[in-house]
C-alpha cells in the first residue's frame, strides 16, 4: 500500500482523535469570541494546507458571518510589507508547523495585536510556539513535499 493511501485511510481515526482532544480548546475559543468578536478573519497557509484554508474560508464565513480572507504570505517575505491585522483573528495552517511564510504572517499578526491560532500536526513546532492558541490535528506525519492525505484532517478540522 502506498504512503498516501495509508494516510487517507487513517483520516477518520485522526479526525476522531482531533475532535476528542481539541473540543475543550475550541469551546474556549468560541466563548472568547462571543465576548470579543473579531472584525475579520485571515487564514494563512501554503501547499496542501492552502486547500484546507480555502475550504475553511467558506465554512467560517457561513458559520460566523465574519468576512474571511486568505493571506498572501509573500507580501511579508518578498516585499517586507506591513499589514495591520488589529481586531482580526489570524489562523495559520501548517502540517509541519515550520512554513517560514505562514509563520511570518502569524508573527506579524501578533505584533499588530491580532489574536492568533495555529493549526498544526506538530506540538513542538515553530507555529505552535508563535500562536496564542494551538489546535493539534493529530494526523500521521507527512513525509516530504508531496502532501495529500495529511490535508484531509485539516479540512475536517474546519467543519
Regions found by a protein language model. Name each.
Residues 1-37, 116, 144-146, 155, ...:
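Cofactor-/ligand-binding subdomain signature composed of acidic, glycine-rich
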Residues 34-159:
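Glycine-rich phosphate-binding loops that contact phosphosugars or nucleotide phosphates
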Amino acid at each position: 500500500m502506498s504512503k498516501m493511501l495509508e494516510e487517507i485511510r487513517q483520516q477518520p481515526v485522526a479526525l476522531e482523535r482531533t475532535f476528542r482532544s481539541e473540543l475543550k480548546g475550541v469551546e474556549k475559543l468560541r466563548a472568547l469570541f462571543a465576548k470579543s468578536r473579531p472584525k475579520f478573519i485571515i487564514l494563512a497557509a501554503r501547499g496542501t494546507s492552502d486547500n484546507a484554508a480555502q475550504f475553511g474560508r467558506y465554512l467560517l464565513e457561513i458559520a460566523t458571518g465574519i468576512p474571511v480572507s486568505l493571506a498572501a504570505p509573500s507580501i511579508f517575505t518578498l516585499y517586507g510589507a506591513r499589514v495591520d491585522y488589529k481586531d482580526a483573528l489570524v489562523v495559520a495552517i501548517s502540517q509541519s508547523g515550520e512554513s517560514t511564510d505562514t509563520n511570518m504572517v502569524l508573527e506579524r499578526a501578533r505584533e499588530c495585536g491580532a489574536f492568533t491560532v495555529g493549526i498544526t500536526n506538530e506540538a513542538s513546532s515553530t507555529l505552535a510556539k508563535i500562536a496564542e492558541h494551538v489546535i493539534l490535528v493529530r494526523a500521521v506525519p507527512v513525509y516530504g513535499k508531496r502532501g495529500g492525505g495529511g490535508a484531509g484532517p485539516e479540512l475536517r478540522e474546519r467543519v
